[in-house]
Design a protein with these regions (language model features):
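Sec-dependent signal peptide recognition
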Residues: 2-9
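Hydrophobic h-region of N-terminal signal peptides that target proteins for export
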Residues: 10-19
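Proteolytic maturation boundary segments
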Residues: 20-58, 285-325, 330-331, 365-366, ...
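M16 family metallopeptidases and their MPP-like homologs
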Residues: 59, 64-77, 82, 86-88, ...
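Short, conserved charged micro-motifs
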Residues: 188-190, 286-290, 344, 400-404, ...
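A common structural junction motif
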Residues: 197-204, 296-304, 410-421, 646-655, ...
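A conserved hydrophobic secondary-structure block that centers on an alpha-helix together
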Residues: 255-269
C-alpha cells in the first residue's frame, strides 16, 4: 500500500514539476489591445488595462451562453472614515437606486427635494437633543415623500430582470465592494450600457427607506452570536488595522447619523477607473467585448487613489480570554493572526489549515471529530490582503466546559507545531487543492471569483495557480518551522456563553411613512434598454433519450451515464428512492460510515487513504431520497470505488462510537432550543403539517438510546439489496465505467423491497391561524403557509410567471412593497412551491424577517398582498421576458443532467419541462395569473408562524390575524 502511495505521489510531483515552468506572465496583443496572461492557466484568463486605468479581466468558457460578471472597486470598509463607518456598505445599497437618467421621472424637480433632504440630514447629525432630532426626522420623512413622487423604484432591478440576469447582488467587505450579475451572452451590450450609466452619476434617492433596510441588517447581526464573536475576535487581533477597528456594516452611532455628503465624497474618491475592474467569465469574444467596454466606460477619468498606511500589529504580552453572551448555543473560537495573501508564504498558511482540518484526514478530523471528543470542531482560513486569520471553533458535548474544548483544540495546534502528523498529509493537501481547482475553474462563477480575488487582494493570479505545486513541494520541517513562527501569542480566544446580551444596542425604528413606487412609470433610458433589438439565443433542452445513456448493472439497478468532456474528474452516485421519511434510523446508520472502519482498516486509515487519493465520499439522507456520492480524479477512480464498496459491505460499528454519537445527537437536539433557525423550521413544519410532522416524528430520544450496533450494521450491509440507481459522470465511456463499477459494486441476489416514504399531508385550514413560539431575540421571523394544488405539469409556465412577478426577486411586487416602499424588512420573499413528486401538493410560502416593533405593519402589508395582487402590466411583461431569456440561455450541465432527469421522473414528466416554459410563457395573460393568485393563494386560509420575544411582541393582539396558539419548544420539537 505504501508503495502504491509513493508511486502515485511521484507521478503527481513529476507532472506538477513540469507544470511549475508554467504560470509565467506573458504579454500579447490582439486587434490593438495588449493583454497579459499566464502560461498554463486553466482559465485562459487575460488581463487588460485601458487608457483610463480601468482593469478588465476575461476568461472565456463556451459551455453555456451566459456570462458571470463582477464590477469590483478596491475599496471597502477599510476605507471608511473613522467617524463615519459603514459608508462603503451604504453606497453599495445606493448603487441600485439609479442616476439622473434612470430611477426618476423628472430629475430636475426631484433634485430640489433631494438637496433639501441632504441638508436636513447634515443638520440632523449635528443635533443631540432627541426631541429636536425627531422633529427633523419627521421633516426628512415628509420631504422624502414629495421627492418619491418623482422617483421610480427598482428601475435597475427591472432592467437586469428584463435582460434575463440572475443572481443580481452586491457585497461589501474589508477590501472591496463588488457588484455581480449572471447574464445571457446575447445581452452583453445592454448590460454594459446599464452598468456604465449606473456608475456615471449615482443619485442618493429613496435614502431613508434604504437606511431602514441597513438598520434591519444591523439588528439581524445583533441576534447572530456568530457575528458578535467574529467582530470581537477581529477587534482583539487587530488593534492598529481597520480589520479590527471598524466593521463593514458600521457602528450603531454612525448608522444613526448618516451623511449623504460623506457618502458622495467616498464615491468620488474611490469609484475611479484605476481603482476598479470589470471581470467577465463565460461566453463572449474578448476583443469585441473589450472594445464595447472601452466605449461604455471611457468617460471615467483616472484619479490618484491614496494607499492606506499600515501600522504593524504587536505580539500580545498575554492572552486574555473574551466572553460574549447570547441566546444561541455555546462555543469557543480561537483566532490566529497570520501574514496576508500578499505574503510569498501564503501557501504555507493554507497548508496549516489543511493539516489541521480538511473535513477528511486533518488533525481535527482524525483526533477530535472522528473520536467524537467534542460535539463539533472545525478550522478555516479567512484570507485577506494584509493579514489572514486562522480560525478554530469547537462546540461542547454533554458535560463539557468551553475551557475543555479549548484545550482539545489547542492540543492540535501543538501537534502541528511539533510535527505530530503524517508527512503524506502535506503532499495530499496539494493534490486535493489541485483537484478542487480543476473542478472550480470549469465553472464560470468560481472562475470569476478567483479572478476577482487576485484583483482586489492585489496578487498575480499565477500566485494562486501555483499554490498546489508549492504545497506539494513543501517539506515537513519547513511547515513545522512556519507553524512555530506564526502560531505564537498572536491569537484570540472567545468564549461564547449563553446569557442575556446587555452590550449590543438595537437600532430603534424611526417613524417613517411608505413612499410611492410608481411601478408603471418608466424613464426614457429604461425604455430604450427594454426596446433594444437583440439576436435571440437558441434554447437547448435535455433529450432524456439521447443525452443520458442507460444500461443495467443488475436486475432493478440501472446505470445512468453522461460524459465529462471538460476534465478528468468523476462523480459517482448511488441513489435510493427512499429517505428518512421511510426510516428515521437511516441518517444515524449512514453517519457511522464516516466514523467506523472494517475488518481490514480503521476509520482513520480509511479517511487518510481517501484523502491521499483526492477522493471524497459523502452520504446524504434527504426526506424522500438517499444518496451515497464519491468524487475525485479518474486516476484514482478504481481504488476509491473498491474501498467505498468494501466499507459499506463490511462496516464494523464500534459500540463506544455509537454511544458517543447518540449522546452528541441528544446534545444537538438540546442545542436546537437555542437556535432560532431550527426553531423557525420546526414551527413552520408544525404550521404546515400539524402536530405530526417531519420534525415531531423523528426518532425519539428513548428510541435513540435503544439502538444497537447490530441494527446499524445490518442496515448498512443490506443497503445495496434495495433498488437503487447508479449515476456516473466522468471521462470514461459507459462500457469502461460500467465494467469497473460492476467489478466492485456487487448486488445481492436476494433483494429487499424498498421501504415506503411516509406521506405528510398539509393542513387545509378552515380559518386563519397564528402560531407563536417565544425566543429572546431583537428581530421577529414570520412565515406564511397555505396548502397548494396537486401537481399539474401544465401549470409550470404559469407558476414560473407568478413567482417571477409576485415575489421571487428584487423586481417583484412583494419585495418592492415590503422593502422598497415600506422599509419593513431586509430579507423578504414569497413564492408558490411545486411539490417534489407527482402525488403531493404544492405550497404557498412567504417570509419576512423584521424588527419586533414592525411586526404588525409587516403582517398587515403581507396580508394585503395575499388578498390583492398589485397590477402592473410593465412588470408583468418584464417578468415574462426574463423567464424566456433565462430559459433560452440556461444549460443544465455535468451530473446535474442526471439529477434533473430523476427529478422529472418523480413528477412523471417524460421530457424536459423547460421546453414548455420557454414556449408557453408569452401566451400567459395577466388575468390568468390573477386567477391563479385568487384560487391558490387568496382563497386559502393562511397560517402564520412567528418566532420572536414575548417581551417585545404583544401575543394577545395577534388574534386579529387569526386564532392564536402559543407553542412551546417541547411541542414543536417533540424529541
Amino acid at each position: 500500500m505504501r508503495m502504491k502511495f509513493l508511486t502515485l505521489t511521484f507521478l503527481i510531483l513529476c507532472s506538477l514539476s513540469s507544470n511549475a515552468q508554467f504560470f509565467k506572465e506573458k504579454k500579447d496583443s490582439s486587434k490593438g489591445y495588449v493583454y497579459t496572461y499566464f502560461e498554463g492557466d486553466p482559465t485562459k484568463s487575460r488581463k487588460y488595462i485601458l487608457k483610463n486605468g480601468l482593469t478588465v479581466i476575461m476568461s472565456v468558457n463556451i459551455d453555456k451562453p451566459r456570462i458571470y460578471t463582477c464590477i469590483a472597486v478596491k475599496a471597502g470598509s477599510n476605507n471608511d472614515p473613522k467617524n463615519n463607518t459603514g459608508l462603503a456598505h451604504y453606497l453599495e445599497h445606493m448603487l441600485f437606486k439609479g442616476t439622473d437618467r434612470f430611477g426618476t421621472s423628472d430629475f430636475a424637480k426631484e433634485k430640489v427635494y433631494l438637496d433639501q433632504i441632504e441638508a436636513l440630514y447634515e443638520n440632523y447629525n449635528k443635533v443631540k437633543d432627541e426631541k429636536q432630532r425627531k422633529v427633523i426626522y419627521a421633516q426628512i420623512d415628509s420631504v422624502s415623500a414629495i421627492a418619491a413622487k418623482y422617483s421610480i423604484a427598482n428601475e435597475y432591478d427591472k432592467m437586469v430582470q428584463n435582460i434575463g440576469a440572475q443572481g443580481t447582488n452586491a457585497f461589501t467587505s474589508f477590501e472591496e465592494t463588488v457588484y455581480i450579475n449572471d447574464i445571457p451572452a446575447n445581452q452583453i451590450d445592454a448590460w454594459l450600457e446599464i452598468e456604465s450609466e449606473r456608475f456615471r452619476n449615482p443619485i442618493l434617492r429613496l435614502f431613508h427607506t434604504e437606511l431602514e433596510a441597513v438598520y434591519e441588517e444591523k439588528n439581524i447581526s445583533l441576534d447572530n452570536d456568530d457575528e458578535k464573536v467574529y467582530e470581537m475576535m477581529y477587534a482583539d487581533l487587530f488593534k492598529n488595522h481597520n480589520y479590527g477597528l471598524q466593521t463593514t456594516i458600521g457602528k450603531t452611532e454612525h448608522l444613526k447619523n448618516p451623511s449623504l455628503s460623506k457618502i458622495r465624497e467616498y464615491y468620488t474618491k474611490n469609484y475611479v477607473p484605476n481603482n476598479m475592474a470589470i471581470i467577465l467569465s463565460g461566453y463572449f469574444d474578448p476583443e469585441e467585448t473589450l472594445a464595447k467596454i472601452e466605449k461604455n466606460f471611457g468617460y471615467m477619468v483616472k484619479k490618484e487613489v491614496k494607499k492606506r498606511k499600515l501600522v504593524p500589529e504587536k505580539i500580545k504580552d498575554k492572552i486574555v480570554p473574551i466572553e460574549v453572551l447570547g441566546e444561541e448555543t455555546e462555543f469557543v473560537t480561537i483566532g490566529y493572526r497570520l501574514p496576508g495573501m500578499q505574503s510569498p508564504e501564503n501557501y504555507k498558511s493554507i497548508l496549516l489549515k489543511e493539516v489541521l482540518e480538511n473535513s477528511v484526514a486533518g488533525l481535527i478530523d482524525l483526533n477530535i471529530n472522528k473520536k467524537l471528543l467534542v460535539l463539533e470542531a472545525s478550522a478555516y482560513l479567512e484570507e485577506n490582503k494584509d493579514n489572514n486569520v486562522l480560525i478554530l471553533r469547537g462546540y461542547p458535548k454533554q458535560g463539557q466546559t468551553l475551557e475543555q474544548v479549548k484545550d482539545i483544540l489547542m492540543a492540535q495546534i501543538d501537534s502541528l507545531k511539533f510535527g505530530k502528523f503524517d508527512e503524506k498529509l502535506i503532499s495530499s493537501a496539494g493534490f486535493n487543492l489541485k483537484v478542487n481547482n480543476e473542478k472550480s475553474y470549469a465553472d464560470i462563477t468560481s472562475t470569476a471569483f478567483s479572478l476577482l480575488n487576485s484583483f482586489t487582494k492585489e496578487i498575480p493570479f499565477s500566485k494562486k495557480l501555483a499554490e498546489p505545486i508549492q504545497m506539494m513541494k513543501t517539506k515537513k520541517i519547513d511547515l513545522v518551522i512556519y507553524a512555530k513562527m506564526q502560531l505564537k501569542n498572536n491569537y484570540s480566544i472567545i468564549y461564547k456563553r449563553q446569557g442575556k446580551d446587555t452590550v449590543s444596542v438595537k437600532i430603534i425604528k424611526p417613524e417613517i411613512h411608505p413612499v410611492p413606487l410608481n411601478r408603471d412609470k418608466i424613464s426614457r433610458f429604461v425604455k430604450n434598454i427594454m426596446d433594444n433589438e437583440i439576436t435571440e439565443v437558441k434554447p437547448q433542452f435535455i433529450d432524456f433519450e439521447k443525452d443520458i445513456l442507460k444500461d443495467s448493472i443488475a436486475s432493478n439497478c440501472q446505470i445512468l451515464y453522461t460524459p465529462n468532456k471538460k476534465n478528468n474528474l468523476f462523480t459517482l452516485n448511488y441513489v435510493f428512492e427512499f429517505g428518512r421519511y421511510a426510516d428515521q434510523k437511516l441518517p444515524i446508520a449512514l453517519e457511522m460510515l464516516k466514523l467506523c472502519g472494517t475488518d481490514k482498516q480503521s476509520s482513520s486509515n480509511l479517511s487518510k487513504e481517501f484523502y491521499n487519493l483526492a477522493c471524497t465520499f459523502n452520504v446524504s439522507v434527504a426526506d424522500e431520497q438517499m444518496y451515497i456520492q464519491l468524487n475525485g480524479p479518474d486516476s484514482t477512480f478504481e481504488r476509491a470505488v473498491s474501498i467505498l464498496d468494501y466499507l459499506i459491505k463490511n462496516l464494523k460499528v464500534d459500540e463506544d462510537v455509537l454511544e458517543d454519537l447518540i449522546n452528541n445527537i441528544l446534545q444537538e437536539r438540546e442545542n436546537n432550543n437555542f437556535d432560532k433557525n431550527a426553531i423557525r423550521r420546526a414551527l413552520n413544519n408544525y404550521a404546515k403539517f400539524g402536530a405530526e410532522n417531519p420534525t415531531t416524528t423523528q426518532i425519539s430520544n428513548k428510541e435513540l438510546k435503544r439502538l444497537k450496533t447490530k441494527d446499524i450494521e445490518e442496515k448498512i450491509h443490506d443497503i445495496f439489496s434495495y433498488n437503487h440507481k447508479v449515476l456516473y459522470f466522468g471521462p470514461r465511456d459507459l462500457i469502461s465505467a460500467k465494467s469497473l463499477i460492476v467489478k466492485y459494486h456487487t448486488i445481492p441476489k436476494n433483494r429487499n423491497e424498498s421501504p415506503t416514504n411516509r406521506v405528510f399531508n398539509q393542513i387545509q385550514y378552515t380559518e386563519p391561524q397564528v402560531y407563536f413560539t417565544d425566543f429572546n431575540m431583537v428581530q421577529a421571523e414570520i412565515n406564511w403557509n397555505s396548502q397548494g394544488a396537486n401537481y399539474d405539469s401544465r401549470k409550470a409556465p404559469l407558476i414560473e410567471v407568478f413567482n417571477e412577478y409576485y415575489g421571487a426577486g428584487m423586481a417583484s411586487v412583494f419585495f418592492q412593497t415590503i422593502r422598497e416602499s415600506k422599509a419593513l424588512a431586509y430579507s423578504t420573499y414569497a413564492d408558490y412551491k411545486n411539490p417534489t413528486n407527482s402525488t403531493s401538493q404544492g405550497n404557498f410560502f412567504a417570509y419576512v424577517g423584521t424588527q419586533a416593533d414592525k411586526l404588525d405593519s409587516a403582517i398587515v402589508s403581507v396580508n394585503a398582498l395575499i388578498r390583492e395582487i398589485p397590477i402592473s402590466e410593465t412588470l408583468f411583461e418584464n417578468a415574462k421576458k426574463s423567464i424566456t431569456s433565462v430559459a433560452a440561455s440556461e444549460r443544465i450541465l455535468n451530473d446535474k443532467i442526471l439529477f434533473y432527469y430523476l427529478k422529472s421522473k418523480r413528477l412523471n414528466n417524460t421530457y424536459d419541462l423547460r421546453k414548455d416554459i420557454f414556449e408557453k410563457t408569452n401566451q400567459i395573460s395577466f388575468p390568468e395569473m390573477q386567477a391563479f393568485h385568487t384560487n391558490e393563494i387568496k382563497a386559502k386560509n393562511q397560517v402564520i408562524s412567528i418566532v420572536g420575544s414575548k417581551d417585545r411582541i404583544d401575543v394577545g393582539k395577534l388574534n386579529k390575524y387569526g386564532k392564536v396558539q402559543v407553542l412551546t419548544l417541547k411541542e414543536i420539537f417533540n424529541y
